[in-house]
Amino acid sequence: MSLFDWFADRRKGQYVANVKQEPDEGDGLWSKCPECGQVVYLKDLKLNASVCANCGHHHRIDSAERIALIADPDSFQVLNADLAPVDPLGFKDRRAYADRLRESQASTGLRDGVVTGLCRVEGIPMGLAAMDFRFMGGSMGSVVGEKITRLIEDSTARKLPLLIVCASGGARMQEGMLSLMQMAKISGALERHREAELLYMPLLTHPTTGGVTASFAMLGDLILAEPKALIGFAGRRVIEQTLREKLPDNFQTAEYLQEHGFVDTIVPRTQLRSTLANLLRLHGCKPMELTSA
């Protein structure tokens, strides 16, 4: 059997990725919690920041919902909204990268997988980036990296603290080295932000993996995480096969990482804005007017 035939067999279903599938969440009016099975009215779930009132499970939310939970009302100013990805490599796997981009843009209304801007949190100005897992798994390509880098540089110039909400499967393979170099570019911008003695906090949400974890997600002065978020670099099964040993059941969860010193604090979504405001005040940040972006 040739190598090509070997891969073809696996594409037919002999190899199944170890991905936990989300259960059906209802018909648009109701949502079923994947953790406890509780069926809840969708409007009630949204009013509770998409957190299950029965078990505390944090449902996945998009970038717009995330920004609304963090920023003071009407305070968010979008930056670099006109940046959009291209296909410099002409990449094609099962489908062309250009087709995947068009599909994600149509389904999400976004140009790429992150929204960046300036906002206030209880009157305190800061830079804010919110990654959106709906857009190609929140993967980090050249536009995601450029928008985050520009936000960091703008926050540094304005002497503002910074929060990046991470939700990503890692570097975008369809862009090859162009995506991988974003790790170093963002890290360099964060170092200049640190040299200016400014506060940077990443918020690790479910999931935060791959090249995002290996770069800016772990470079914060304070590393925050949502409860039970999946956080890691390589997949659990890959690690088990490499080490040839069974990993703990809670391995790569926010709680496991906090226990081992990789996460500073776990913040329930319903307490996020007040917690951020307290942390900003503790670091000497004060309410002030935010000039236009």
UniProtKB/Swiss-Prot annotation:
Its cofactor is Zn(2+). Pathway: Lipid metabolism; malonyl-CoA biosynthesis; malonyl-CoA from acetyl-CoA: step 1/1. GO terms for molecular function: acetyl-CoA carboxylase activity; ATP binding; carboxyl- or carbamoyltransferase activity; zinc ion binding. Belongs to the AccD/PCCB family. Acetyl-CoA carboxylase is a heterohexamer composed of biotin carboxyl carrier protein (AccB), biotin carboxylase (AccC) and two subunits each of ACCase subunit alpha (AccA) and ACCase subunit beta (AccD). NCBIfam families: accD. This is Acetyl-coenzyme A carboxylase carboxyl transferase subunit beta. The gene is accD.
